[in-house]
Regions:
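A substrate-binding/cap region within the structured catalytic cores of diverse enzymes
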Residues: 1-7, 18, 22
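Second-shell residues forming the walls of enzyme active-site clefts
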Residues: 13-26, 30-167
Length: 167
C-alpha cells in the first residue's frame, strides 16, 4: 500500500505538493526522482513483496495515478514494478515497452533519465540478470540493484552493457 509513503490518495493534492517539493529542491540545487511512474496510487499491495496488478480503466488511470507525473517534472523518474493490464497484461511497467514508450515517454512527456526500481524485488518474476536486461530493453536508461549482495552485483556487471556515451 503506497498511501503511507505518499502525500495523499488524492491526485490533485499529490500533484500540488509534489510540484512544490520539486521546485524547492531544485531551487536549492538538489536533484529529485519522481516515483513510481506511471503510478501506484491504486495499488493495494507492496511491490517489494508482491506484484501489484492495477485493474483500473485507462480513463481512471489517466485521471488518478498518471496525473501527478504530468504535473511534477523532474530530470529523473523511477519505474513501478506493477502490471497495468489495460495497457500491457503481461509485463510490469519496468519491463513494458508499451508503457514506457506510450504512457511514460509520450502521454506523460517524460524526457529525463528513466531508472528501474530495485531489480531484486520479489515483484519481478525473472532472475536478476533477466530482470535487468528486460528493463533496459523496455526503455529504462539505468537499472537499480539495491540489496547490497556483491555476488549478485558481480554477475550483473558481466551482463549489463557498459555506458560508453550519453545520447
Amino acid at each position: 500500500d503506497i498511501a503511507s509513503r505518499s502525500f495523499s490518495e488524492n491526485s490533485k493534492v499529490v500533484s500540488n505538493l509534489g510540484r512544490l517539493c520539486i521546485d524547492f529542491y531544485e531551487k536549492n540545487k538538489i536533484a529529485t526522482v519522481i516515483k513510481h511512474i506511471p503510478g501506484l496510487g491504486l495499488s493495494r499491495c507492496d511491490s517489494h513483496y508482491k506484484t501489484p496488478i492495477i485493474n483500473a480503466s485507462k480513463d481512471e488511470l489517466f485521471k488518478k495515478d498518471f496525473k501527478p507525473f504530468k504535473v511534477c517534472r523532474s530530470l529523473f523518474a523511477m519505474t513501478a514494478h506493477a502490471v497495468y493490464p489495460k495497457f500491457d497484461p503481461y509485463n510490469t511497467a519496468t519491463h513494458s515497452k508499451i508503457i514506457i514508450k506510450k504512457v511514460i515517454r509520450c502521454h506523460m512527456n517524460f524526457k529525463g533519465l528513466l531508472i528501474s526500481d530495485d531489480i531484486s524485488m520479489k515483484s519481478l518474476k525473472y532472475g536478476l540478470e533477466e530482470n535487468a536486461l528486460r528493463a533496459l530493453h523496455a526503455g529504462c536508461n539505468l537499472v537499480l540493484h539495491c540489496n547490497g549482495n556483491m555476488r549478485e552485483m558481480s554477475k550483473l556487471i558481466k551482463v549489463i552493457p557498459k555506458i560508453d556515451k550519453f545520447t
